[in-house]
Amino acid sequence: MAARNKARKRAFQILFEADQRGESVQSVLADWVRLSRTDDRQPPVGEFTMELVEGYAQYADRIDDLIVTYAVDWEIDRMPVVDRSILRLGAYELIWMDGTPDAVVIDEAVQLAKEFSTDDSPSFVNGLLARFKDLKPNLRREQ
């Protein structure tokens, strides 16, 4: 598994855990970093994972607003936690990071949905992130 793929998976797991525990993503990230330094069985939390989590945290409210606006007939709190976490991560990387092609960001999010969520989730994630990709220039300006 490529390093960035692993980093995205870890970032997703941190967002998921924070949502499940009702804690901030920064707090859960700090727990993961601390644990990786004290437990040899835990892999280190890489720089790209930290960049994704911290970046999401910076735009969390805006990202949730976008999901609510464009996820037709879905309330964010009724959405499966897995899907919500994948969408949050994908939206941040897609809209605010420029280092990865949009198609790769969307594909990686779809792969996470295939691995961790329901049979319907990959197409839902793909559709919503594709919509964000199409609107990306406007979404960045509306910050």
From Swiss-Prot:
Purpose of the protein: Involved in transcription antitermination. Required for transcription of ribosomal RNA (rRNA) genes. Binds specifically to the boxA antiterminator sequence of the ribosomal RNA (rrn) operons.
UniProt protein name: Transcription antitermination protein NusB
Cellular component, GO annotation: cytosol
GO-annotated molecular function: RNA binding
Transcription as UniProt keyword: yes
Keyword list, A-Z: RNA-binding, Transcription, Transcription antitermination, Transcription regulation
Gene3D superfamilies registered for this protein in UniProt: NusB-like
Family the entry assigns: Belongs to the NusB family.
Keyword Kinase: no
InterPro entries cross-referenced by the UniProt entry: NusB-like_sf, NusB_fam, NusB_RsmB_TIM44
Gene Ontology biological-process entries: DNA-templated transcription termination; transcription antitermination
Pfam families: NusB (PF01029)
Gene that produces this protein: nusB
